Amino acid sequence: MKRLLLLVALLTAVPVQAERYDFGQGVAAMACSMLDSGYSRREVENVLDSLERFIIRDGISARGQRQMVKGYNYQTARLGCELEYRD
């Protein structure tokens, strides 16, 4: 149930400037927080994959994708999260 609520919260935030570095950083911070809260890596990666599909489906530009990924990868490295590198 918590996972479903978290996914809904993420999806409602997607249209708000998804094409920015800080959005990617925010997603990474949320994902790292999920890991710290006891979610398995697989559960977190599944949420991230779902979010990625929704963002792409909504028509994010290639430039926006690069910015988001750069922010995400920067933040996961900075926080030392054991999450997959996105490209």
What is the predicted role of each segment?
Residues 1, 21, 38-45, 62:
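Low-complexity, intrinsically disordered regions enriched in charged/polar residues
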Residues 42-87:
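Compact alpha-helical subdomains of small soluble proteins
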